[in-house]
């Protein structure tokens, strides 16, 4: 089992956004989030808390045009940081799953730290993508975030909305269930010798 610190510091600077992100996979869930998109701050704070990942994000962007660029770019950087912090993935549990309710909403997430980016995202009710959940954060942004994280972290992720009416509840349950599943998958297991794959690499 690896004894190296599983931390990362990633920055991204484009004409659309400026992002500085630090994380510690073996943290306590502490966070300092400032993305200039308040609802996204709320979701990333929930992700950190429930995945026990210490997370600091400072970001600015062209949110006067749309929040899309900033939201997606932070997802990209978060995915890159997760990949970097995981290292060679030695000693991890690898798989995680979680079923999380938020009042009437219920979401299941399954995570495999596989090295093979793949997202299955389903079950959101009709009209969810167009709904303004908080400020200019629409339901469509939720999928964009998971796509960015999944691709850049090298994860296989299934997020399934099993029920819900309130868009805020649905989105928050998605982030929390993903966080809980990721927490299980990234955990170090002293019984795991080396990389948890019969191929010897992830």
Curated annotation (Swiss-Prot):
Its EC number is 4.2.1.19. The keyword Ribosomal protein does not apply. One of its GO terms (cellular component) is cytoplasm. Keywords: Amino-acid biosynthesis, Cytoplasm, Histidine biosynthesis, Lyase. Pathway: Amino-acid biosynthesis; L-histidine biosynthesis; L-histidine from 5-phospho-alpha-D-ribose 1-diphosphate: step 6/9. It catalyses: D-erythro-1-(imidazol-4-yl)glycerol 3-phosphate = 3-(imidazol-4-yl)-2-oxopropyl phosphate + H2O. GO terms for biological process: L-histidine biosynthetic process. It comes from the Bacteria. NCBIfam families: PRK00951.1-6, PRK00951.2-1, PRK00951.2-4. Belongs to the imidazoleglycerol-phosphate dehydratase family. This is Imidazoleglycerol-phosphate dehydratase. It comes from Clavibacter sepedonicus. The lineage of its organism: Bacteria, Bacillati, Actinomycetota, Actinomycetes, Micrococcales.
